[in-house]
Regions:
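Positively charged, amphipathic and often flexible ligand-engagement surfaces
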Residues: 1-226
Length: 226
């Protein structure tokens, strides 16, 4: 009763200026309520015919492929093309700790990074398979993952098929190769830059998460893949 009216108001404002809006809760225990709000939003009469509604999914969640199936069905039922931002996930430690504290039989996330990497590619393939219903947004700073998606998407690229995304100030050398011209030996694919905006108090926690997420990627070998 409190959250949805705010979300709806914000989405209507986004439509007024034709700015896409993604629902991103991240934590596994907020997934259901996030999907409930997304479904309600997709059937708002005032938002009919607008393809600026999006959702963020985390590849480290074991439910991720099934969430994608639901999102594809939702896009079909609501007769719109949903933006789906695919990330690997930045709250692994919190998810593991919460599952342990709650005494769960298993974890909601994969416990090995290699499994998350494979999940990301499997989910990317599902998203690319329904271009009429899904606009994939691939958020990654991993060169191996990026190259695999480029290959999965095929060479018959057309504007609006998909996009890559990076965080402001991170992965710039990699994305210079992505957005450069084919004539210069580069990929010529779009990249959206995510730049956080807010107060110092709000941004500090975000910055710490990004530092923790990428703090281990300092060696030369890791930099090749990240």
């Amino acid at each position: 009763d409190e959250l949805y009216p705010r979300l709806n108001s914000l989405t209507l404002l986004a439509r007024q200026y034709d700015i896409g809006i993604n629902i991103d809760a991240e934590e596994a225990d907020r997934l259901e309520i996030s999907l409930d709000m997304l479904e309600k939003l997709c059937f708002e009469p005032e938002l009919a015919g607008w393809n600026g509604i999006g959702f963020v999914i985390q590849a480290y969640l074991k439910r991720c492929p099934f969430v994608i199936d639901y999102l594809i069905d939702l896009a079909s039922r609501s007769r719109r093309r949903l933006m789906i931002r695919l990330v690997k996930g930045a709250y692994w430690d919190s998810e593991i700790k919460r599952a342990q504290m709650d005494g769960l039989e298993g974890y909601p996330v994969y416990t090995r990074k290699v499994h998350t990497d494979v999940s990301y590619l499997a989910c990317a393939k599902k998203l690319l398979g329904v271009p009429n219903l899904i606009y994939p947004q691939f958020a990654t700073h991993n060169a191996h993952t990026l190259a695999a998606i480029y290959s999965l998407a095929g060479q018959n690229y057309y504007p609006g098929q998909y996009e890559f995304q990076c965080l402001h100030g991170m992965g710039e050398p990699l994305y210079e190769q992505v957005t450069g011209k084919v004539a210069d030996g580069k990929l010529n694919r779009p990249c959206r830059i995510y730049a956080p905006v807010g107060t110092h108090e709000t941004l500090l926690a975000y910055l710490v998460r990004r530092l923790l997420e990428n703090g281990a990627n300092t060696s030369f070998v890791n930099r090749i893949a990240d």
